[in-house]
Amino acid sequence: MINTAHLRKTLTLAMLISSPWSLAQAADYNALVSANATGANAYKTIAEAIASAPADSSPFVIYLKNGVYHERLVITRPNIHLHGESRDGTVITATTAAGMLKPDGSKWGTSGSYTVRINAPDFSARSLTIGNGFDFPANQAKDNDDPTKIKDTQAVALLVDDKGDRVWFHDVSLTGYQDTLYVKGGRSYFSKCRISGTVDFIFGNGTALFDNCDIVTRNRTDVKNQQMGYLTAPSTNIKQKYGLVIINSRVIKEKGVPAKSYGLGRPWHPTTTFDDGRYADPNAIGQTVFLNTSMDDHIYGWYKMSGKDKQGNTSWFHPQDSRFFEYKSSGKGAEKNAQRRQLSDAEAAEYTVNKVLAGWVPTAPKGK
């Protein structure tokens, strides 16, 4: 039970969503976060509000007033829900890159570079921005012999980790450059979201459904007349039916991004330790599927990705050996050719929201 000292407050949060579910027009909240927070259940940091949640799994709803919150958050309690005042006005940000050093001198690595890490089930967030503010363009502009230049530029904004399941994001913006969104856990649902980046900026082995979202490729000034990046890098296990599924969405670009400069995805086979050595996971037969999605002219199709074999040599993994498909793509970036395989109507019928999410129906939470 929640401590009776927690006041019940009610906010009217008008929400519009073009998904099979409608959100409640009002939601109770258990804590308020604001730079000017005063009084019971009001906090100046999101971390403090999360820490105030009781040690159970009851829904705990936190309302975030507009502002920029410079925090790195780890969610380990089930049923935490973050509701922002507005998507572009409520911003959670940090500036950690994989190649930066921890206090002990080791590197953060990709998994450690997150701004927000979800490692518990039944989390949701809506009407806010989660960003990794690592200045990728400024770093890339440095000379290669500059000792301050970071070599490992992966910078995750959101990590849905191993214990993350039934995770829902609505009207959320995820901003970064390389590796913006890492879906490592179970099932995630992104509705009416905006996700931006450059290289492999939606990646991982989890099941993630993107419904009516904007996938935004960013401009780069450090590369000319060559591939700028890739939207996805799935590492879905072959035994897992669904990976990264994008439906009824838009693949768009920032100003200055040239035609045919971005790939829809490439197959990531993570280097993994096995009984007979450490090498690229042969069972990571990644899946990315685009259905009923419009694509601007910067899209050229799929691309290959390298890994290490048992002897430590470079080996290449190709789109045709992965589960990469499209269905009814439209726009200047849409093409039908041997490299861009298409689903039949019958095959596309297997990619309903209910089937991809394995029966989980996202519902709006209420606090107590």
Regions found by a protein language model. Give the residues of each.
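Sequence-level preference for short, compositionally simple segments enriched
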Residues: 27-368
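Sec/Tat signal peptide C-region and signal peptidase I cleavage site
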Residues: 21-26
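Bacterial N-terminal signal peptides that target proteins for export
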Residues: 2-11
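Bacterial N-terminal signal peptides
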Residues: 10-20
